[in-house]
Amino acid sequence: DKITIIAVDDGSTDNTWEVLKKFEKHSNIKILKKENGGKHTAVNYAIQNSDSEFVSCLDADSFVEPETLKRMMTYFLKDENTMAVAPSILVHNPKTLTQTLQQVEYNWAVFMKKVLGILGGIYVTPGPFSIFRRKVFTDLGLFKKAHNTEDMEIAFRMQKHHYKIDQCNDAYVYTTGPKTIVALYKQRLRWIYGFVMNTYDYRKILLKKEYGFFSLISVPAGVVSMIAVPYILGLLMFQIFKGIFKLIEKYQTVGFDFNFGWNFAWPNFDMFFVSTNAYVFTGIILYLLVMSTIIIGKRMITGKYGFDFRIIYFMVIFSFIAPLWVVRAMYNAVFAKKTAWR
């Protein structure tokens, strides 16, 4: 009797409304119908038709563990200044390689988001089941379209007004995750584009001490990574083509043979007189740090330490595909090309 479920039909063209009507007899379930306007309008419509002290939204492709709600609510009970709590998102029963890679990535995210929660640096409250005090919406307003990343914009807005956001690492919400690389690319393109544009929208609060870790480290680190990824990708491609040209030059000089020896050092720019060893060493350290945080994240979820070879698959494959959506998102941002939801 303490929970009210509001289901919104956002202008569907199938039999969604007929299915929802089967639940209207339940006293704690309210069904609403509106013209299609996008997720943020549907969530706002539900908020406007509710009167509860706490508000949460659950995506259609997600579900929660039985104890998740109770675990998240303890954060509000312990600290009345906590205005939102984010859960840990996990991939349910991955069936494709793409979903398996996301499962490993989300293990890493469990650890990183907990750290951000402790330091006050959370910049996104995930759509699936983040819980807010109603005060957030009465004081700051409802969700905005925000470049199709309303869950990120509301977190930026809350940080701007010094509203505390925490993260409950043992509150698990499961999602299916994109099944194909193409679907994953579209999802991440939207996420990265949203980050770039929301950062630009809230640029006036960046690098200011009064906004704490969020302003000084969390978002700037994301911006640096946006710049570093295409830069590193460029260096890598330069070295690859440089190696190919050296092979061609060698074959032209000594004739064709089957000796494919290639001394690959990444990256090696003689023009800058930079030691290749320093780049290689830094790269190794970064990979080891990511690997360690993935293992720690998995430990937080399962209670057990252990190395999983899927970590290697994730790090190798994502190293090649992640720059694609990062570069495209930055291109879209620079040339004002909006991204679609799907």
Predicted segment positions?
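Short, conserved alpha-helix that lines the donor NDP-sugar binding/gating region
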Residues: 17-21, 39-48, 155-156
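Acidic donor-binding segment of Leloir-type glycosyltransferases
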Residues: 1-33
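Hydrophobic, aromatic-rich membrane-embedded alpha-helical segments
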Residues: 312-329
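Catalytic donor-sugar/metal-binding loop of nucleotide-sugar-dependent glycosyltransferases
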Residues: 155-173
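Basic/Trp-rich segment in TM-proximal cytosolic loops or flexible interdomain/linker regions
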Residues: 179-183, 187-315, 334-342
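Acidic metal-phosphate-binding loop of nucleotide-sugar-dependent transferases
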Residues: 62-63
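Long helical/loop segments within the catalytic core of UDP-sugar-dependent glycosyltransferases
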Residues: 24, 35, 40-42, 52-53, ...
